[in-house]
Design a protein with these regions (language model features):
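Membrane-helix interface segments
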Residues: 70-71, 189-190, 224-225
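Hydrophobic/aromatic residues in alpha-helical transmembrane segments
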Residues: 11, 56, 60, 96, ...
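Small-residue-enriched core segments of transmembrane alpha-helices in multipass membrane transport
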Residues: 80-81, 197-206
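Small-residue-rich hydrophobic transmembrane alpha-helices
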Residues: 74-138, 173-195
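Hydrophobic faces of transmembrane alpha-helices in multi-pass small-molecule transporters and flippases
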Residues: 9-13, 28-59, 63, 84-88, ...
Length: 258
């Protein structure tokens, strides 16, 4: 809470001093039904989308927890490391959201196309760096978060296996976030919501059925765990197909409905 409040305070002071036109005056505090409608139109589908995605994550976490305490410890190790790896991709998508929104409002559609192209190039550049870091450190990540004497072979296996499967697929997350930003910036929030449903279905189906299909005699085997690890990349792939395909159609085929 303190960190978030400090961040808000510093940011507010900065833009208040740097950008006078962003200073809120009493005359600005009034309701505009068109703006309210747009906020609900964009915000509600995205809110529901994140709720749906968290449901899928809960299902995956429940299945991983069934593998025992070592698997649970591995989750606490690889999740923050995964977050570190994806920071560049997340930052680019956030910047792209603002860029698309501004240029869509100004009807500078060619700049949006250029921004998409440049972001993909930057995603690929960061991806290769992430790939090297993720694969080379996969088996060493537990030592970062837990004492060396507690990092047994099972924890290292669960953590390294997940990262070795996930890291090569992080380019999908970059494309997913880029597509989501483009769709949000062009006020098409319903498509990310639908992709979230597809992602949820894909993740749940893999978590529920793949372990038993791989090893029906022992659905908690190492091979079954590997199958569960693929649930995240498959969910990303489903979202990329839905949202990426929509971006191609809207931006390049329909030219923003022009």
């Amino acid at each position: 809470i303190i960190a978030n409040f400090s961040n808000f305070l510093i940011t507010a002071i900065y833009f208040y001093k740097k950008y006078p036109y962003l200073r809120i005056q009493p005359s600005n505090i009034k309701l505009d039904k068109n703006i309210i409608f747009d906020l609900f139109k964009i915000g509600l589908p995205l809110g529901f989308q994140w709720s749906i995605l968290f449901i899928g994550s809960f299902v995956q976490a429940e299945k991983v927890n069934a593998f025992g305490r070592s698997a649970q410890t591995a989750v606490s190790c690889y999740q923050p490391f995964e977050g570190y790896l994806t920071i560049p991709l997340s930052v680019l998508s956030t910047a792209m959201l603002s860029f698309v929104g501004q240029n869509y409002g100004a009807q500078n559609y060619n700049r949006i196309k250029d921004g998409i192209k440049d972001t993909i190039i930057l995603d690929l550049c960061f991806y290769f760096i992430i790939l090297i870091l993720g694969l080379s450190l996969a088996s060493k990540v537990p030592y970062i978060f837990i004492p060396r004497e507690d990092a047994n072979d099972e924890i290292i296996f669960y953590c390294a296996t997940y990262l070795r499967i996930l890291t090569p697929c992080l380019i999908l997350q970059g494309l997913l976030q880029l597509s989501r930003s483009v769709l949000q910036g062009t006020k098409r929030a319903i498509i990310p919501f639908l992709s979230g449903i597809g992602e949820l279905v894909g993740r749940i189906l893999i978590c529920l059925f793949i372990p038993s299909l791989i090893n029906s005699a022992n659905p908690l085997s190492n091979e079954s765990y590997i199958g569960i690890c693929f649930s995240t990349p498959v969910a990303w792939l489903i979202s990329v197909i839905i949202m990426g395909g929509s971006v191609i159609y809207i931006v390049y085929k329909k030219n923003f409905n022009q």
